[in-house]
Amino acid sequence: MQYLITTAVCLLAGLGAGLGTGFAGMSAAAVITPMLVTFLGIEPYTAVGIALASDVLASAVSAYTYGKNKNLDIKNGLVMMITVLIFTVVGSFVSSLVPSVTMGNFSVFMTLLLGIKFIVRPVMTTKADMSARTAKSVLIKSIICGIMVGFICGFIGAGGGMMMLLLLTSVMGYELKTAVGTSVFIMTFTALTGSVSHFAIGGLPDMLPFILCIIFTLIFARIAAKIANKASPKTLNRVTGIILVILGIVVLGFSLLSNITA
């Protein structure tokens, strides 16, 4: 019976996380962590490690799919990724020096707000609009956005995927598919770094939820990325917005449930 419950929870967690990653470049940690903590009683630190490990392959397969469809900016993505990684460490260090800030639901609110934004004000930037930007301005914006995302992620420990998507579409002027493709490309490496450090510090988790979450998230991320790359910009904005709003509400519900039962 316990195996059945674990499989069902991991399937639902992988479904939500995979769709969020493939459609919107959302971090799997936002969905998987609260579900594992609430329904399987897994320690939050271990649950985050499992979620980050699930993120690695799901983000990698999504990035490959977006890249194959020419919806990935590797050059500027690498610049942003390096700055994100450096300033995540800086943010973590600064966070350790100041009184603890509890912003556990930050990424959930980011998810909800972004979802509403995509429905109400879709990102209709085109590839032609993107090519009008100068290489220098894109490079400078990549560094600035990387610093912001990295520092905030390190400081409060959440919100990377959604913040990246917001900055890539609103500040850097990417069209939605390229923004998601670049976001999942960066997340592949940030999630890998995060999961390795988690398990190096806290030890390996229970193998069943670990393997199931990775497999289910990977499958649904692959499906979502394939659909997203074939969809029209208007449809993709709407679908992405609806998925983010639903996931935001569901995760917020799990968070409230775990607080009530705690």
Predicted regions and their residues:
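A small-residue-rich subset of transmembrane alpha-helices
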Residues: S54, T182-H198, L208-A221
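Membrane-helix interface "capping/anchor" motifs
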Residues: L19-A28, K68-L72, V171-G181, K234
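Membrane-embedded alpha-helical segments of transport systems
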Residues: A53-V61, I86-V90, V94, F185-T193
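Membrane-interface alpha-helices at helix entry/exit sites of multi-pass transporters
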Residues: I42-I50, K75-N76, G173-V184
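Transmembrane helix boundary and interhelical junction motifs in multipass membrane proteins
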Residues: F23-I32, G157-L167
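Juxtamembrane transmembrane-helix boundary motif
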Residues: M1-A17, T33, V37-F39, P44, ...
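Hydrophobic, membrane-facing alpha-helical anchors
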Residues: M1-T6, C10, A53-Y64, G159-L168, ...
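Transmembrane helix-bundle signature of multi-pass membrane transporters/permeases
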Residues: G18, V48-V56, V180-A191, L244
